[in-house]
Regions:
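Membrane-interface "cap" regions at the ends of multi-pass membrane proteins
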Residues: 4-67, 176-179, 192, 198, ...
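Small-residue-rich segments of transmembrane alpha-helices in multi-pass membrane proteins
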Residues: 47-56, 119-124, 128, 191-205, ...
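Hydrophobic alpha-helical segments and their helix-loop junctions in multi-pass secondary transporters
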Residues: 26, 30-33, 96-99, 142-146, ...
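Hydrophobic, small-residue-rich membrane helices and short re-entrant helix-turn-helix hairpins
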Residues: 110-119, 180-189, 250-280, 302-305, ...
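Membrane-water interface regions at transmembrane-helix termini and the short interhelical loops
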Residues: 72-76, 103-104, 148-156, 170-191, ...
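Membrane-interface helix-loop-helix modules in multi-pass membrane proteins
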Residues: 42-110, 236-247, 254-298, 309-329
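Helix-loop-helix module between adjacent transmembrane segments
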Residues: 82-176, 243-247, 328-335
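Membrane-interfacial loop-to-helix junctions in multi-pass transporters
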Residues: 10, 47-50, 121-129, 157-166, ...
Length: 358
């Protein structure tokens, strides 16, 4: 079954446009609080644990988490939660192993980027390698988030894919470039509130109510395999968890969050907070996918399950709210990728080799 396009009314579209305008205004507000490079790239190194936790949650709960997990829930069942569960485990491991040392070392060296740490510990050659891989990874990851956001807008509004892509990209690049990490933090707080409201507070109860009215339930009407945690295949699950957890130790945004904390304990506690929050989103996204299998069993693509549920069963007004909840997950991942990629390009390439006096 194809997903209906353009089924949103004026109210839904207005909610989306107000959301985009709000992100731009937050970027402008944050730009007025900039006093130097530290403020721009690492928020003045003074953020509390809740802000750090929000940055972690926002950065890791992106399009691949919400859309991918719900898609796996639709196709495979509860085993689809493994990817986001691995993110939560990664947060815990990183919190106890790396968060405090990174904050302490960055305070001594006064560094801003991950490659700067590499340069101080090893040499310039290794730092350049770290910079190039960081920039390439962030470009690819950011582009993927832009595409995910554009695809959702395209499905639900009927706007052309090109227009949706440009809109998502322009809004994100604008508020990041004007406000830096403070803008990312302010917008991420709003975006995570919207994500929880859209996916957990609104979408889950609406789907539950729809199933109850239809006289069906997950446990009675889904195949038994949908409740097998190993249905994805244990080799795949182990490989996925290992690669996800290890990626925390090589991703520059992990270091940025720790450097931005006001002290070492805050860096650790904030990361633990994120792990708890991530598990809530993992459960909600998997549930939406499994509920979608009963509500809309013949979708052409499991990747469209959240968009399809919004289009087909949600009332107008809530369509827009749930959509911006999902968009928030995508945009909050893209913004930190834009910031950290630009930080590495500026600090580790431009200032190091092209214009050292900048």
């Amino acid at each position: 079954m194809p997903v209906g396009r353009g089924k949103m009314n004026v109210l839904d579209i207005a909610i989306i446009l107000v959301y985009f305008a709000g992100m731009i205004l937050l970027g402008l507000y944050a730009s007025r609080k900039q006093t130097g490079v530290d403020d721009y790239y690492v928020g003045g190194r003074s953020m509390g644990s809740l802000k750090i936790g929000t940055l972690w949650m926002a950065g890791w709960i992106g399009g691949s988490s919400v859309i991918g997990t719900s898609s796996n829930g639709y196709s495979l069942g509860i085993t689809g939660a493994w990817y986001v569960t691995a993110i939560a485990v990664g947060c815990i491991v990183f919190a106890f192993v790396m968060a405090e040392p990174i904050k302490r070392i960055s305070g001594v060296l006064n560094n801003i980027t991950f490659p700067e740490l590499i340069r101080h510990r090893y040499d310039v050659k290794n730092s350049v390698t770290a910079s190039i891989t960081t920039i390439l990874a962030m470009v690819g990851y950011t582009a993927a988030q832009f595409v995910a956001g554009a695809s959702i807008l395209n499905v639900l509004t009927g706007w052309s894919l090109g227009v949706c892509y440009v809109l998502a990209a322009v809004v994100i690049v604008f508020y990041v470039s004007t406000g830096g990490l403070l803008a990312v933090t302010y917008t991420d707080i709003i975006q995570m509130i919207l994500l929880v409201l859209g996916v957990v507070v609104f979408a889950v109860p609406l789907c539950t109510n729809y199933l109850a009215n239809a006289g069906v339930s997950l446990t009675a009407d889904l195949p038994q395999s949908y409740f097998d945690f190993g249905a994805w295949g244990w080799p795949t699950i182990i490989a996925l968890c290992a690669s996800t957890i290890l990626s925390f130790f090589t991703s520059m945004d992990s270091f940025t969050r720790c450097i931005a904390a006001k002290d070492a304990r805050t860096a650790k506690v904030g990361t633990i907070y994120a792990a708890i929050s991530v598990l809530v989103i993992a459960g909600a996204s998997t549930y939406l996918g499994m509920a979608g299998k009963l509500i809309l069993p013949n979708l052409d693509s499991a990747n469209n399950v959240v968009a399809a549920l919004v289009v087909e069963i949600f009332p107008h007004g809530l369509k827009g709210l749930v959509l911006i909840g999902v968009l928030s997950a995508i945009m909050s991942t893209a913004d930190i990728s834009v910031l950290t990629g630009s930080a590495s390009l500026t600090k580790d390439i431009y200032q190091q080799f092209i214009n050292p006096g900048a």
